């Protein structure tokens, strides 16, 4: 479990080659040295995604290669919302299909209705995809991206611009 948690937390931005080296040369030796119990064939993906889940993702358009499956497992498991660098648009196709039942809304940073879309999705528990993100994000999105929730009574709120919008925990970004 610790290896899988470390995998989700640290390897998402690395290449397949570097991920493998990090696991084999750093993470596994560290865990063994500290007597953390684990199976001989320790594969973080085994705990992160069952074969049925991987098959479902494949049916939703996710490519069957190991890196795509690892990236998908990281994106659905991580506490933070993923930033996908997707020049071949394979991940976008998968996310759109995967989230189609969650009333996925797509928008862009230059869309004049961006904040309205974000408010609607946060309040309605809908998924939202911001496409073509460049190097800088608008600061008004920082509380949303960081999930800076404010608890009032039994409800959570997130600051969107100058408003506090009720946050439904099922919202995905």
Where are these regions (language model features)?
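Conformational switch/transducer regions in large eukaryotic molecular machines and scaffolds
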Residues: 1-173
């Amino acid at each position: 479990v610790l290896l899988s948690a470390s995998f989700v937390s640290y390897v998402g931005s690395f290449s397949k080659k570097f991920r493998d080296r990090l696991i084999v040369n750093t993470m596994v030796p560290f865990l063994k040295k500290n007597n953390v119990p684990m199976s001989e064939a320790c594969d973080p993906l085994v705990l992160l995604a069952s074969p049925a889940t991987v098959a479902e993702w494949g049916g939703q358009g996710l490519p069957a290669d190991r890196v795509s499956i690892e990236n998908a497992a990281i994106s659905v498991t991580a506490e933070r919302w993923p930033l996908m660098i997707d020049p071949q648009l394979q991940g976008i196709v998968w996310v759109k299909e995967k989230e189609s039942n969650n009333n996925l809304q797509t928008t862009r940073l230059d869309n004049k209705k961006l904040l309205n879309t974000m408010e609607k999705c946060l309040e309605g528990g809908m998924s939202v995809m911001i496409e073509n993100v460049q190097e800088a994000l608008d600061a008004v999105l920082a509380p949303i991206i960081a999930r800076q929730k404010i608890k009032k009574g039994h409800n959570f709120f997130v600051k969107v611009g100058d408003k506090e919008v009720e946050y439904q925990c099922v919202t995905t970004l």
